[in-house]
A protein has these predicted regions:
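Substrate-binding strand-loop-helix patch
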Residues: 201-208, 229-250, 263-268, 308
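Conserved Rossmann-fold NAD(P)-dependent oxidoreductase catalytic core, especially the SDR/UDP-sugar
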Residues: 98-142
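N-terminal Rossmann NAD(P)H-binding glycine-rich loop of SDR-like oxidoreductase domains
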Residues: 8-33
Length: 323
């Protein structure tokens, strides 16, 4: 692992979110760098972070780059974590603000930008996935556009894309990830879910492991990484059935029989309960293998894994194990 080089000033957006809080914590603990946090509500910054003499907090709407760019000072590295999840805000934050901040670094001598995309916009080989642009939600389409535009700036500044898969994380004072919230919500229904099996394959990753990789890439030489630098973050792929079995084993459940939820049965359930599917939902139903040929975790960079298995992640988000 490279030792942190000269002290840097690092801009972080989205610092009060799930991944953002782990990232700030990681950088303060493992590097000498100073952090500039652009946050709308400084009250959401943990007190120990806000009181650190290495942290500068700028109260601002991240999408209003013109309104705060003159207060940024020298920025060596930007970690663009903030996300707009839907509506016009998705494009204002995910595209416009991220590109404006990248351009600001280019004009003012910045060295590196790490932006956050999503695994949904690339295929198993890391190529851009056209259906994501055509069928995706506003969030997914905006992330697709971000990748297209920000990679054009790679000749002027180091550009590294981080593409998390399903994110576990939260608890102990940190905001829950969407996936963690979903698992907590389905926990009371595990007695029913235990009887079903389904096709599919995917990755998951803990937010702290995302933070470790991002922290490493702040200082590491980038030559070993293939271009374009699209770093898919995840544990080894698991099938849907393996995930269900691990979840049930953690809860101490062992079903006496199982029913495979094939596409015809799924369609019947959708019609019975009048479930509304978006074009992207329908696409994902038809393309259930969401695994990638090359994924990265802290172990790939010589760092310890925080969450090497599902049981560790479930315990951390507060799902009690059944004794």
């Amino acid at each position: 692992m490279p030792a942190p080089s000269n002290e840097k000033r690092i801009l972080i957006t989205g610092a009060t979110g799930c991944v953002g809080q782990y990232l700030v914590e990681e950088l303060l603990a493992e590097t000498p760098h100073k952090l500039v946090l652009v946050v709308r509500n400084p009250g959401k910054v943990p007190s120990d972070v806000a009181e650190s003499d290495r942290v500068e907090i700028l109260k601002a709407d991240v999408s209003d780059v013109e309104g705060y760019s003159d207060r940024l000072g020298r920025i060596d590295v930007a970690l663009l974590v903030a996300a707009g999840w839907g509506g016009p805000n998705a494009f204002r934050v995910n595209v416009d603000a991220n590109l404006a901040l990248t351009d600001h670094l280019v004009r003012n001598g910045g060295g590196r930008v790490l932006y956050f995309a999503t695994g949904s916009v690339i295929d198993a080989e890391g190529r851009m996935l056209l259906p994501a642009k055509e069928l995706g939600s506003e969030y997914i389409r905006s992330k697709y556009q971000l990748v297209e535009e920000i990679e054009k700036r790679s000749g002027a500044i180091d550009i590294v894309g981080l593409y998390p898969t399903l994110i576990l994380g939260g608890g102990n004072g940190k905001p829950m990830s969407h996936f963690a919230n979903l698992l907590r919500e389905v926990r009371p229904w595990a007695w029913l879910a235990q009887f079903f099996r389904a096709d599919g394959k995917f990755h998951y990753v803990h937010a702290r492991d995302i933070a470790r990789v991002a922290r490493y890439l702040v200082d590491a030489p980038l030559d070993p990484l293939p271009e374009p630098r699209r770093i898919v973050l995840g544990n080894p792929a698991v099938s849907a059935n393996e995930f269900i079995e691990q979840f049930l084993a953690y809860l101490g459940l062992r079903p006496p029989f199982t029913i495979t939820l094939r596409e015809s049965l799924a369609e019947w359930i959708i019609k019975l309960f009048r479930i509304q599917l978006s074009p992207w939902d329908r696409y994902c139903m038809q393309h259930r293998d969401l695994s990638y040929r090359r994924v990265y975790s802290p172990a790939d960079f010589g760092l310890p894994m925080h969450c090497p298995n599902l049981a560790t992640g479930l315990a951390e988000i507060g799902i009690p194990v059944r004794r």
